[in-house]
Amino acid sequence: MSPKTETKASVGFKAGVKDYRLTYYTPEYQTKDTDILAAFRVTPQPGVPPEEAGAAVAAESSTGTWTTVWTDGLTSLDRYKGRCYDIEPVAGEETQFIAYVAYPLDLFEEGSVTNLFTSIVGNVFGFKALRALRLEDLRIPPAYSKTFQGPPHGIQVERDKLNKYGRPLLGCTIKPKLGLSAKNYGRAVYECLRGGLDFTKDDENVNSQPFMRWRDRFVFCAEAIYKAQAETGEIKGHYLNATAGTCEEMMKRAIFARELGVPIVMHDYLTGGFTANTSLAHYCRDNGLLLHIHRAMHAVIDRQRIHGMHFRVLAKALRMSGGDHIHAGTVVGKLEGERDVTLGFVDLLRDDFIEKDRSRGIYFTQDWVSMPGVLPVASGGIHVWHMPALTEIFGDDSVLQFGGGTLGHPWGNAPGAVANRVALEACVQARNEGRDLAREGNEVIREACKWSPELAAACEIWKEIKFEFDVIDRL
């Protein structure tokens, strides 16, 4: 090893401040299969060299501090330090670059997303030498991912539980999201499920407010589920939001949901926290509950291109922490999401092995080994005219969730659900017959309108609705 990067006790203690790059920039380093690898988009302050900025990120997110300390001599920092092992420019950006950092596995507690994030993104993002910093991607080695349970059940087990195959699942978020009484809320759930949906959903901020306490909502929703199941012969569910102010209260709500015999509960995993989410995921596996995950607050973290954390990192974290569904954008609706980038992290959620593909924002090959997959949920500003595109983009292993696109139907909730189910079945049949939904999708919907008045009414009311804005999240 070069003397410039030597940090063992034999060197002796020399007080003072030295450049991070002397210790933490190691371009000759060969990454190990057990290393956790990170790709950071770094924007240094003027005058800070890329090598120093990249090394500072590696140092401050692992063993380093701002000055040399004598206790460095009590351990082998070469074993534990993060290393900036490569730097590459960002096309079209003179002041930005990608710094690749390798972290030894021993830096992280097994089975703890909380500890992983506390180390890698917990402190370094406030570092003064950097104008901005964004974590673009992580490579989680099998040696670490195998310490996590992961999703409570996964895609195949969910399909077996629901006895539903060969198509996306259909959902609906009950609106208005706040203000309904528990009984009226349950009525809306029943009407949507009776009309043909597989799931209905609590909105992310429905917890236990004065107008509708959680226990009342759970009871009326369970009644709606059982009534709809009896009338349709299909298994139904409602995402009962167990998110609460304390972990103990969250678990109380999940336990009550299990006692009611419902199939699925819900958690806001970012506002609720990874420790709470992992605890709930373990309970759900042990007790046969599916777990729907909402990503409320994600855009605070991932919306800006130069600072924060890309959603693909949050998606990987969720797969480790545990969830059977997670919201993933729509590409075509009202919420942010560019197609190639979105499909990149959708594959990271669903597939076992994902190759590095920079055209889709995937910086590292990811091998999940045997960890179950997560169903991506497309939700936000979508309606029946979007059904062909959603079916083509997301494929069968997804949940397509229409809130206003169900409850906004001019004839009511049940006809809105009928319209969505008919549109989905028509698109799946057309695809299975070999038709190109990307090119013929509108024609498929128009043909289905001829024998479904509910779909025809929905198509008429939403024919002019579009959400066309420039996408922020580009490569």
Curated annotation (Swiss-Prot):
PROSITE patterns listed in its UniProt record: RUBISCO_LARGE (PS00157)
Sorted alphabetically, the keyword list is:
Acetylation, Calvin cycle, Carbon dioxide fixation, Chloroplast, Disulfide bond, Lyase, Magnesium, Metal-binding, Methylation, Monooxygenase, Oxidoreductase, Photorespiration, Photosynthesis, Plastid
Q: Give the binding site residues for substrate.
A: 123, 173, 177, 295, 327, 379
Q: Can you supply a Gene Ontology BP term from the record?
A: photorespiration
PTM remark = The disulfide bond which can form in the large chain dimeric partners within the hexadecamer appears to be associated with oxidative stress and protein turnover.
Which stretches are tagged as propeptide in the UniProt entry? 1-2
GO CC terms on record? chloroplast
Question: What residues bear N-acetylproline in this entry?
Answer: 3
Record-level Gene Ontology MF annotations: magnesium ion binding; monooxygenase activity; ribulose-bisphosphate carboxylase activity
Q: How is the cofactor bound?
A: Binds 1 Mg(2+) ion per subunit.
Location in the cell reads: Plastid, Chloroplast
Q: Which Pfam families does the UniProt entry name for this protein?
A: RuBisCO_large, RuBisCO_large_N
Domain of life the protein comes from: Eukaryota
Q: Which cofactor does it need?
A: Mg(2+)
Q: Which residues carry this modification: N6,N6,N6-trimethyllysine?
A: 14
Instruction: Please state the Enzyme Commission number of this protein.
Output: 4.1.1.39
Q: Which residues bind Mg(2+)?
A: 201, 203-204
List the InterPro entries: RuBisCO (IPR033966), RuBisCo_large_chain_AS (IPR020878), RuBisCO_lsu_C (IPR000685), RuBisCO_lsu_C_sf (IPR036376), RuBisCO_lsu_fd_N (IPR017443), RuBisCO_lsu_N_sf (IPR036422), RuBisCO_lsuI (IPR020888)
Q: Which reaction does it catalyse?
A: 2 (2R)-3-phosphoglycerate + 2 H(+) = D-ribulose 1,5-bisphosphate + CO2 + H2O; D-ribulose 1,5-bisphosphate + O2 = 2-phosphoglycolate + (2R)-3-phosphoglycerate + 2 H(+)
N6-carboxylysine carried by residues: 201
Marked site (Transition state stabilizer) residue numbers: 334
Miscellaneous notes: The basic functional RuBisCO is composed of a large chain homodimer in a 'head-to-tail' conformation. In form I RuBisCO this homodimer is arranged in a barrel-like tetramer with the small subunits forming a tetrameric 'cap' on each end of the 'barrel'.
As for what it does, the entry says: RuBisCO catalyzes two reactions: the carboxylation of D-ribulose 1,5-bisphosphate, the primary event in carbon dioxide fixation, as well as the oxidative fragmentation of the pentose substrate in the photorespiration process. Both reactions occur simultaneously and in competition at the same active site.
Would you identify the family this protein belongs to, as annotated? Belongs to the RuBisCO large chain family. Type I subfamily.
Subunit and interaction comment: Heterohexadecamer of 8 large chains and 8 small chains; disulfide-linked. The disulfide link is formed within the large subunit homodimers.
Q: What is this protein called?
A: Ribulose bisphosphate carboxylase large chain
- The species this protein was found in: Pinus radiata (Monterey pine)
